[in-house]
Amino acid sequence: MKDKLQQLRSKIDELDTKLVRLLNERTKLVLEIGKIKHASGDEIYAPDREDAVLRRIVEKGDGPLPADSLRAIYREIMSASLALEKPLVIAYLGPEATYSHMAVIKKFGSSLKHEPLPSITDVFTEVSKGRADYGVEPIENSTEGAVTHTYDMFVDSELKICAQIVLQIRHNLMAACPREAVKRLYSIPQVFAQCRQWLQVNMPHAELVETSSSTRAAQIVKTEPNAGALASSLAAEMYGLTILDANIQDSSENVTRFLVIGRKYPPRTGNDKTSLMFSVQDRVGALHDSIASFKKFKINMTKIESRPSKKKAWEYYFFVDCLGHCDDGRVKKALGELAKHTMFVKILGSYPNVNG
């Protein structure tokens, strides 16, 4: 039995040696591509190419590694390669170990520089001024609805949406003490609300203390006795806390969608989504006529959100997501028709319609 075990381990060692050699060969090719991109002025990060690579890898996989594991492995490979091509800076709404941070890692891996910032406005500003290459912003949550501040920032910004990230939100009870010793729980109001039923059943007598972020809750709990935090698994890992109960949110469909913002949006992939905004005149049927443009050219409109313009009373901007790329023929025709019925149309970006 021991001989068999040693043989298998030796085989794994041989495969690991081959993997390292192949990874280095792959990286050399990536660096050559980076030189070509740099010479032509192309963006180093290409969401369309990333999507194609991940889809191909998943299609080639025949087990036993599941698709999610293959994506995670190749995400880190691509992250390390990107870091060698150019030390990209990814700005996000901080602090560290929040779900925004987890979204950054899911999309960009852990080899690039992640820059936590205090506000959504700061993320837009850093990318606009070139101090960050890309920004990651929350746009909507399946239980809490739209993140209106992100929508508002697009009104005057020239930045474009170049990718999206869909992240399952999984809240966890963590502490530095046994579960039965926990008397106080720290977190933000939204997390307490999303775990209300679980708390009533499992910790009805615990004192709930609100903090500025779930990360701050984990920081407090690291040193405070008899305290627990409701936060992300990344927070537990970062602050050395034990997860006492995992996935304690009341809804299993708690999902947040994030947008990646940059200076350009990628070319079409054949499976894309377009985000845009427009404004209509104050007349009967104006919005109906505008939306009919999508139906006329058989474009699936997947979301519409309205926001006050803040420039004139009762004037609104409408934000729309639709399937297809703005360079697709039918989408172009629909946008042309839309322009006839609106005061203005602004394309916010076209990007791969994947969960990131």
Where are these regions (language model features)?
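Domain-level signature for soluble enzymes in the chorismate/prephenate branch of the shikimate pathway
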Residues: 1-356
